Amino acid sequence: MPFVIAYPVIDPVLLSIGPLPIRWYALAYIAGLVIGWAYARHLVARASFWGGRVRPDLGVIDDLLVYTALGVILGGRLGYVVFYNPAFYLSHPLDVFKLWQGGMSFHGGLVGAGVGVMLLARRRGLPTLALGDIVSAVAPIGLFLGRIANFIKPELWGRPTDVPWAMVFPGAGDLPRHPSQLYEAAAEGALLFLLLFVAVRLGALKRSGLVTGLFAIGYGCARILCEFFREPDPQLGFLFGGATMGMLLSLPLIAAGLALVAFAYRREAVPA
């Protein structure tokens, strides 16, 4: 039997306040929103990051938190229903509302967040890409913490393997598997640092849509790479030629990112 690392079983409940359990899973998402909100406020407060480009004020960032959070929840759930398990939810339509049972799609959440951004931009009379660039710059914070939460739960584990760091996950049978949640956390964490470096050090926020495009390309490539190690959803399996739904949904994301980067560089950076 190959050497495996013992899975560090962690109580999913951090603490209980009376009858209310506080779960690591929920805490990770809340922390992602709060830290992302704080970093977004930092971005818009620094005029030098934006040059002469129109940027939202701090009040807009507070609204942006609400709009994107709702968009991620609604879009993530609907994306999972449509892309990953439509047959089940057609037979059990009321289960669509049972969010506590799990089942969220990043790509659906991304679409939902995009809709939220567009609605807020229209309401406040701001350029959509100004808000989109902010969301893209902070999104990897939540993605990193979310993948750590997937590992703690545990869920979304990897494929069977004999690598020295393989783990046997509770509920995933007796085979050692890739800790693919940690791979995704690392990739999305690295993406965060890349975006921070590009946005803050190289002035990417001065080019409308550049940060959004870089995020789309970076996340799409990281997701496709990590899908080679992640166990596909059991109700879908492999679609064709070893491809998974996560891979296919990431391809248009990369294409959109490339288009945005090209758009950003066809326009002059806005000087201070």
From Swiss-Prot:
Location in the cell: Cell inner membrane
GO CC entries: plasma membrane
Coiled coil: none
EC number: 2.5.1.145
Source domain of life: Bacteria
Keyword Transferase: yes
Biological processes annotated in GO: lipoprotein biosynthetic process
GO molecular function, one term: phosphatidylglycerol-prolipoprotein diacylglyceryl transferase activity
Biological role stated in the UniProt entry: Catalyzes the transfer of the diacylglyceryl group from phosphatidylglycerol to the sulfhydryl group of the N-terminal cysteine of a prolipoprotein, the first step in the formation of mature lipoproteins.
Similarity section: Belongs to the Lgt family.
Protein name, entry field: Phosphatidylglycerol--prolipoprotein diacylglyceryl transferase
Species in which this protein is naturally found: Methylocella silvestris (strain DSM 15510 / CIP 108128 / LMG 27833 / NCIMB 13906 / BL2)
Name of the gene encoding the protein in the UniProt record: lgt
